[in-house]
Amino acid sequence: MNGGDEVVAASADPSLPLEWRFSQVFGERSAGEEVQEVDIISAIEFDNSGNHLATGDRGGRVVLFERTDTNNSSGTRRELEEADYPLRHPEFRYKTEFQSHDPEFDYLKSLEIEEKINKIRWCQTANGALFLLSTNDKTIKFWKVQDKKIKKICDMNSDPSRTVGNGTVASSSNSNITNSCLVNGGVSEVNNSLCNDFSLPAGGISSLRLPVVVTSHESSPVARCRRVYAHAHDYHINSISNNSDGETFISADDLRINLWNLEISNQSFNIVDVKPAKMEDLSEVITSAEFHPTHCNMLAYSSSKGSIRLIDLRQSALCDSHSKLFEEPEQAGPKSFFTEIIASVSDIKFAKEGRYLLSRDYMTLKLWDINMDAGPVATFQVHEYLKPKLCDLYENDSIFDKFECCISGNGLRAATGSYSNLFRVFGVAPGSTETATLEASRNPMRRHVPIPSRPSRALSSITRVVSRGSESPGVDGNTNALDYTTKLLHLAWHPNENSIACAAANSLYMYYA
């Protein structure tokens, strides 16, 4: 983010509702085009600078994008201060991609391990190189992506561009092929032995030259796997999170959380273990885990019962006890079969400064203050209109969908996904009534329906809970119109700007305000 951007951001009133605009789309599919399962995006993450974006898909690939407009702002300081709109269009471009994970088979457990990327987390950059962690269900990998100078092999004895038949070398010239080169040390596809397609020039080859390797001024990003962290989880990994110390990270599965050092791949420490002595006594599982953004000794993890636990690594080596427990006060009245299912927390995110914590369950988005454990300080209704349809959602397994959430860098807004490729943006600042429903398409406001707010209700004498977005009978005004097969599960908020990247199947949509 450059100086011009900071001036524009400062001049805008953060309390005013944002007007979201379409920015870019990558991998947009045409009407009626079938989406391949391996192309569906399963993870999205901005780096700390916001200049790079990574996506992972079900095919085990990681695709990197880089920002191209960071130095394009123009105008005097006065013009920037007087502007009440963003002066530039945020733009990213494709940088590179690599195969992070491949399908595997666990012969001991007779279990297939999918290549699908579950999570991506960026690490600190060093010496112009990018570092990131990616994980599937069982294995975490540490990647280094760095621009390398392209090397070319020049002054070949035969011209790889002049071929006959199946592509074998056909001619040689001492004068015309001096500049013929093969990039990055590659070789043209020639047969190991002479065949009918190969012909020598008239008079034969007068002399042989030694090819020369030349380093050009061009560069190309190259991804290398630096370390593999494996064989530490018996259950599927659902979370990885970097520590603010830049040296360690955690990985979490259904029953355990492990602490790793980035430099050591053959050893980890189990810091949370919720596995009971008898599995029939199991009452809840870990659903998400996240390090505190500034305190390297603190982390939070959520459970399938709707609770969030804050733990302090300084208390003990095995953090079976928590320092704080955040959960919704138990509601009076009968409970249904679906009560515990819809209470399960699918994702948690710390705000940038670390005081507030955002959580998403099936029905709501909640904001918590880590200094107050009496209950959430705000609750935002996302799927309230689906309550009458819980039986149908259970039958088609949609009730188990895990929607992610994200919070803006300034902590004033939060976003989460829904069905029919819709996502919701809420103002989470005290007193804010901002809500917006957008569609992951080139026209994000096409299906926008204003959603009235509901007054705050008191939770206790200490805190008040704001509940909004619950009065609408449905995002579309008709729940039958919702398409439960098109769901927006993954999205990320730019760390410094009001810009959101979200995944609709195999397409990556980006919006700005």
UniProtKB/Swiss-Prot annotation:
Q: Which residues cross the membrane?
A: none
Q: Where are the WD repeats?
A: 36-75, 112-153, 232-270, 281-321, 340-378, 483-513
Q: Which residues carry this modification: N-acetylmethionine?
A: M1
Give an example GO cellular component term for this record: protein phosphatase type 2A complex
Question: What InterPro entries would the database entry show?
Answer: PP2A_PR55, PP2A_PR55_CS, WD40/YVTN_repeat-like_dom_sf, WD40_repeat_dom_sf, WD40_rpt
Task: Give the domain of life.
Answer: Eukaryota
Quote the function comment for this protein. Answer: The B regulatory subunit may modulate substrate selectivity and catalytic activity, and may also direct the localization of the catalytic enzyme to a particular subcellular compartment.
What is known about its subunit structure?
Answer: PP2A consists of a common heteromeric enzyme, composed of a catalytic subunit (subunits C), a constant regulatory subunit (subunit A), and a variety of regulatory subunits such as subunits B (the R2/B/PR55/B55, R3/B''/PR72/PR130/PR59 and R5/B'/B56 families). Interacts with SIC/RON3.
* Name of the protein in its database record: Serine/threonine protein phosphatase 2A 55 kDa regulatory subunit B alpha isoform
